Structure formats: structure tokens, C-alpha cells
């Protein structure tokens, strides 16, 4: 399989269709191609946690992380999301790229940890940040992901929550490594957004056992 360069990966991910009507309650914000490419490229090149691995993508939305992981040679990548509309777009994206190593399951992510215990080598995710009406969602996603992964979980979290996450990781006896600090360009998708876009500082974190 041809090795993709970072720029090539980002360029391909720019062709992935995103949410048509994002749902505020589900905190649906797209993972920008640049962020997705940097995240996946680091996981692949630095830690070798994608190629030929079983990968889960929690709260996968329209599938940008799953599709990127598939392009980098994942054995199988399975996306999980509660939203049927997002998964429909995800499915179209997979068909357009003619990928055979991607699957998707509609479900409530919270119901997964018991059913999917340690079934995946790697879990990747850009969870809801748990702001607005969904306090604690990010940590609930993380807890589920840790139950599903055999090797590592890679997740994006607001840098402002770093201390809280470090405490939780210690409590759960999980190793934690901040592997990148990124600027997340959050576009104005909802009516309450006053600015066209806002930059949020996020950490790409690796959790391992």
C-alpha cells in the first residue's frame, strides 16, 4: 500500500462531506481535515496504532476520522454514532472513496463499554466537549473508549480541561500523554454563535494501559 504523506491525507479528507444540518444537542461540530490529518498521521507514524489494527471511532459523525484511518491502512475501522443522518452521509462518503475496510453502527455510545469490551486495538475520537447542555459528556465518552481499547485511546480535549483529565486518568490508573497541542477552528454553525469562527486550544491525548 502506498504510504500517504500528511499533505496528501489532508487533501483527501477535504473531500469528505460533513454535516448538512448539525444538531446542537449532540454538539455536532466537524473535525476539520487539517486536525483530522495531523491527529491520524501522528497516531500512525509515531505509535503505529492504525495500520492493520482494529480501530473504533466513537461519535464518528460523517466519518472523517474513520475514513482517514482506513486510508492509512487500518485492518478495519468501525464508526459508532447515535445520529442516523450523520451515518447516512458517512455511508455515502465511504462509497465515494470505495473503501472496504470501514463499517458503521448506529447506537448510543454509552451502551458500548460492556458489549465491546477490549474488542479494538485502538480507539480514536473527537468527543463532544461537554459544554453547553452536556456537561461531562467528554469524560463519559473517554470512560467508554478505555473499556473498548486493548492498546490505546486517542482523543481531542479542550486544553482548559487538561488538569481535570490528568486527575481522572490517575484515578482510573491509565497512562496519559499529551502528544500535540492544536488550534481547533470552530465554525459558526448555530444561531447563538456571534463570531464567524472561534479558535479553541485542544490537546491530542494518548491514553494507554
UniProtKB/Swiss-Prot annotation:
S-adenosyl-L-methionine is among the record's keywords: yes
Catalytic activity: adenosine(1832) in 18S rRNA + S-adenosyl-L-methionine = N(6)-methyladenosine(1832) in 18S rRNA + S-adenosyl-L-homocysteine + H(+)
Annotated binding of S-adenosyl-L-methionine, by residue: 28, 31, 59, 62, 64, 81, 108-109
Tissues showing expression: Ubiquitously expressed in brain.
InterPro entries, per database record: DNA_methylase_N6_adenine_CS, rRNA_MeTrfase/Polyamine_Synth, SAM-dependent_MTases_sf, Small_mtfrase_dom
GO cellular component: cell projection; cytosol; fibrillar center; nucleus; postsynapse; presynapse
GO MF entries: nucleic acid binding; rRNA (adenine-N6-)-methyltransferase activity; S-adenosyl-L-methionine binding
Record's keyword annotation contains Nucleus: yes
Phenotype reported upon loss of the gene: Mice were born at non-Mendelian rates and develop morphological, such as craniofacial abnormalities, snout deviation due to altered nasal bone development and incomplete fusion of the frontal bone suture. Mice display reduced body size and evidence of metabolic defects. Mice also show behavioral abnormalities. Deletion in embryonic stem cells (ESCs) results in a decrease in global translation rate, spontaneous loss of pluripotency and compromised differentiation potential. Cells show abolished level of N6-methylation of adenine(1832) in 18S rRNA.
Keywords assigned: Cell projection, Methyltransferase, Nucleus, S-adenosyl-L-methionine, Synapse, Transferase
The enzyme's E.C. designation: 2.1.1.-
Membrane spanning stretches: none
Subcellular location: Nucleus; Presynapse; Postsynapse
Activity regulation description: rRNA N6-adenosine-methyltransferase activity is inhibited by zinc.
Family from the record: Belongs to the methyltransferase superfamily. PrmA family.
Role according to the record: Catalytic subunit of a heterodimer with TRMT112, which specifically methylates the 6th position of adenine in position 1832 of 18S rRNA. N6-methylation of adenine(1832) in 18S rRNA resides in the decoding center of 18S rRNA and is required for translation and embryonic stem cells (ESCs) pluripotency and differentiation.
Record text on subunit structure and interactions: Heterodimer; heterodimerizes with TRMT112.
Name of protein: rRNA N(6)-adenosine-methyltransferase METTL5
Amino acid at each position: 500500500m502506498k504510504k500517504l504523506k500528511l499533505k496528501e491525507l489532508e487533501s483527501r479528507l477535504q473531500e469528505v462531506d460533513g454535516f448538512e444540518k448539525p444538531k446542537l444537542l449532540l454538539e455536532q461540530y466537524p473535525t476539520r481535515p487539517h486536525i483530522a490529518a495531523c491527529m491520524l498521521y501522528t497516531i500512525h507514524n509515531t505509535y503505529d496504532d492504525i495500520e492493520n489494527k482494529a480501530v473504533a471511532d466513537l461519535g464518528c459523525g460523517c466519518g472523517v476520522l474513520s475514513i482517514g484511518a482506513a486510508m492509512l491502512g487500518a485492518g478495519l475501522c468501525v464508526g459508532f454514532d447515535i445520529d442516523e443522518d450523520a451515518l447516512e452521509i458517512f455511508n455515502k462518503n465511504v462509497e465515494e472513496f470505495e473503501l472496504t475496510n470501514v463499517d458503521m453502527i448506529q447506537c448510543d455510545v454509552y451502551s458500548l463499554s460492556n458489549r465491546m469490551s477490549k474488542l479494538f486495538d485502538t480507539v480514536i475520537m473527537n468527543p463532544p466537549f461537554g459544554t453547553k447542555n452536556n456537561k461531562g459528556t467528554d469524560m463519559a465518552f473517554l470512560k467508554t473508549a478505555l473499556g473498548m481499547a486493548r492498546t490505546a485511546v486517542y482523543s481531542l480535549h479542550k486544553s482548559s480541561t487538561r488538569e481535570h483529565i490528568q486527575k481522572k486518568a490517575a484515578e482510573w490508573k491509565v497512562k496519559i500523554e499529551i502528544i500535540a497541542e492544536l488550534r481547533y477552528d470552530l465554525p459558526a454553525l448555530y444561531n447563538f454563535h456571534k463570531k464567524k469562527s472561534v479558535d479553541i486550544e485542544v490537546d491530542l491525548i494518548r491514553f494507554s494501559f
